[in-house]
Amino acid sequence: MFVLNARHLMAAGLVSLAAWSAGAYAGAVEQLNAFVSNVSTARGEFVQRQVKGGTNGSPLRVAGTSNGDFVFSRPGRFVWRYVKPYEQQLSADGQMLYIFDKDLNQITERKLDASLGSSPAAILFGSNDLAKNFTLKEGGTKDGIDWVELTPKAKDTQFQRIAIGFRSGELQGMELRDAFGNTTLLTFSNIQKNPQLPANVFRFTPPKGADVIKQ
């Protein structure tokens, strides 16, 4: 299972799922399908927020914020780089996933095919066959953003709820809620669709002296 925690990858969204209303424009499901079908490469920036609360009437509070940039080429090749507050990089070359923690000078290595599955990363970086791993439905519109909810078909997934938002076909954010009630929000910006990418952009070279942990 491809799961990235507060200092790793994936999660997301812009707003709470609770207040959504019916949407306009093309439906969110249609926008998502168009995105995964028509965008084979992309690069952009993100802000990731870990949110606590929101259950039993408790207020939402931001427990942590990080930001960075990403680049991907479907299927299964990407670099997801955290810049602040900690430097960390996740690199996938289509076969292997490498998670490099600069502070620890440590690399975690695992096979990518066993990592994507029904994970949030599969939505952004995987193939365009979303229906194989997810059930999709319209999530409504909030503040001009159309949302689609994705429910993993796998029973052993960590995530109870995944949502991804678009505005006029442009990717805006993701939201993840795990089995423990924790929510991660991702806001995307400065996205370039289908840029020409250097051939070696997804080639990971371990830094000298780094510890390597194979999983």
Swiss-Prot record:
Gene Ontology CC: one annotated term: periplasmic space
A biological process from GO: lipoprotein localization to outer membrane
Organism superkingdom: Bacteria
Family as reported in the entry's similarity comment: Belongs to the LolA family.
Biological role stated in the UniProt entry: Participates in the translocation of lipoproteins from the inner membrane to the outer membrane. Only forms a complex with a lipoprotein if the residue after the N-terminal Cys is not an aspartate (The Asp acts as a targeting signal to indicate that the lipoprotein should stay in the inner membrane).
Subunit structure: Monomer.
Name of the protein described by the UniProt record: Outer-membrane lipoprotein carrier protein
The organism of origin for this protein: Ralstonia pickettii (strain 12J)
Gene that encodes the chain: lolA
